[in-house]
Amino acid sequence: MRRILSIFVFAIMLAGCSSNASTEKQHAGGEKTVKAEPQSTSSQKDSTDDYQPNSQVTDDRSLLKVGQTFSDDKGKAVLKDIKQVNKTYKIGDVELTVKDMKLIHLRPDYSMIDYFHELTHDEEFDFVKVFVDIKNTSTKKVNVAPIALMKTNMGETFDWNKDIYLEELNGELEGGAEKSGNLGFIVNASSGHAHDKAADAEKKTKEIKWIEITTSDVFDHKHKKISDAQKIKIKF
């Protein structure tokens, strides 16, 4: 139910993004998504200290070295790769700080299988996650999504409704307000079809080397676009 409500509420906002994307394809000389440039993060606090563990996904904050594991009542997580990013990107009046990126292998507890079942039929799987801070530096309410799309070097592309954390980072952000939390996407998932077993096995042997995040456009309280989306590429 939480996933359905999240999708319903944010679908209205991203309708504008979809419309803009279609227009961009039709008019090659028009507006384009631009690459974001990192800003200084020296004055920012460590928001991970105040983070409340997710109710669906195993807490990974103690996983700082490859090979480390952590288990709780939601499952067992193994850290496969990590990148401390700590860079801030400007999207108009919105500051998006990417704190870190991790590749995690997760074996969910049996009680959590149904939650992940709509995204994968695998009993255990890898996912890529980022911890972000998002801040509205203006005095007026805006609407924005830190990750509207994510793609990997494997050729996989995920939109915002494939996020496994659902920490309400998308949508309205009051003037001067900040949000912090995780966004994560299951990668290299099996197709669930017997005839695709060979292709699934090949996917499992390949490595995630980078991801590219595309934010949403930024909209004002009347859903008028005020800033273009940004693209952010992060390498492990």
For each feature predicted by the language model, list its residue ranges.
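Sec-dependent signal peptide recognition
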Residues: 2-10
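N-terminal, intrinsically disordered, polar/charged segments of Gram-positive cell-envelope systems
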Residues: 5-6, 19-89
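C-terminal motif of bacterial Sec signal peptides marking the signal peptidase cleavage site
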Residues: 12-19
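Surface-exposed edge beta-strand/loop patches
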Residues: 18, 43-65, 149-159, 173-236
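Low-complexity, acidic Ser/Thr/Pro/Gly-rich terminal tails and inter-domain linkers that flank the onset
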Residues: 68-123
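Mid-length scaffold segments of soluble, non-membrane domains
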Residues: 107, 114-166
